[in-house]
Amino acid sequence: MILDQLVQASQQRVQKVPVRERVKRIQQARKMTTPVLSFEAMLAQPGLQLIGEVKRASPSKGLIAAEFDYLQIAQDYVAAGIDAISVLTEPRYFKGQLSYLQAITQTVSVPTLRKDFIVAASQIASARIAGASAVLLIVAILTPVQLQAFITLAHELNLSALVEVHTTAESKQAVAAGARIIGINNRNLKDFSVNFATSCQLRQAVPAECYVVAESGIQTATQAQQLAAAGFDAMLVGETLMRAPDKGQAVMQLRAGVRG
C-alpha cells in the first residue's frame, strides 16, 4: 500500500534526527514570536478560496515538473491572485524539501501550508520555524491521541491545522480531536484513486463551525462552482495548476463564475 510506504519513509526520516535535536526544535518553535499570516483568516473571506500547490512529483503521476523553479511557480500563483500556497515537503515520493517551503514563505505575501506525512511533533515545529501558516494532519495515519496532541501543538505554535479526511468516520474523529479546518480529500490514499464526488458527499458531515477545504481531482470551473454551491470555503489544486503552461490563465479558468 502506497500510504504505508509514505508513512514508513516519514517515520524513518524523523528517527534519523537525534531525539535531543527534535526536542530542541520544538523548544525553538515554542519561543518564536514572529507573526505568521493567518490561514484561517484567508478561509474566512467571502467565496471559494483557491490554494495552489507547489509539487514536483507524486507516487501516482511520477515527475510532474521536470523544470521546477519553485519560487517562480509560487510568484506566478500570487500574481494570478491565489489565496494561499501548499508546498509539498516530502522528499522521496514527491521530490519536495522543507527548504522550498521556507524560501517560498519568505518570498510571497499569502499564507503557506506544509503538506507532508506528519507523524511527529518535531515536524510541526519545523513547519513553524520555516515560517508556514499551517500544517497538514492526515487522520488516516494518526491515532486519536496523536491527532489531538498534534492539533493542540499546532495551535500553541500559532499554526493552523488542516485536518485531512476521506470518510465520514474520519471526519467525526477530526472534529472530536478539536479540528477547526477539515480537508476532504477526493483521493483515496490507499490506492491513490480519485473520486470528485467524495467532497460533496462528505461535506454535510462537517459541522458548520468548521472551515472545509476540498482536495484533489479538481480540474474545471464547473467543479469549482459545485464546491462553492456545496458551501466549501476553499479548494486545494495541485496537478491541474502545476501542469498548466500559463498558471494565471489556469487560475482564471478555475475561478470562472466563482467569487473568491
UniProtKB/Swiss-Prot annotation:
Keywords for this protein: Amino-acid biosynthesis, Aromatic amino acid biosynthesis, Decarboxylase, Lyase, Tryptophan biosynthesis
EC number annotated for this UniProt entry: 4.1.1.48
Membrane as UniProt keyword: no
Domain of life: Bacteria
GO molecular function: indole-3-glycerol-phosphate synthase activity; phosphoribosylanthranilate isomerase activity
UniProt catalytic activity: 1-(2-carboxyphenylamino)-1-deoxy-D-ribulose 5-phosphate + H(+) = (1S,2R)-1-C-(indol-3-yl)glycerol 3-phosphate + CO2 + H2O
Disulfide bonds: none
Single GO biological process annotation from the record: L-tryptophan biosynthetic process
Keyword Nucleus tagged: no
PROSITE patterns the record matches: IGPS (PS00614)
UniProt cross-references to Gene3D superfamilies, sorted A to Z: Aldolase class I
Pathway terms, separated by semicolons: Amino-acid biosynthesis; L-tryptophan biosynthesis; L-tryptophan from chorismate: step 4/5
Pfam family, any one: IGPS
InterPro entries: Aldolase_TIM, Indole-3-glycerol_P_synth, Indole-3-glycerol_P_synth_dom, Indole-3-GlycerolPSynthase_CS, RibuloseP-bd_barrel
PANTHER family the record matches: INDOLE-3-GLYCEROL-PHOSPHATE SYNTHASE, TRYPTOPHAN BIOSYNTHESIS PROTEIN
Family the UniProt entry places it in: Belongs to the TrpC family.
Protein name, UniProt field: Indole-3-glycerol phosphate synthase
Organism: Lactiplantibacillus plantarum (strain ATCC BAA-793 / NCIMB 8826 / WCFS1)
Gene: trpC
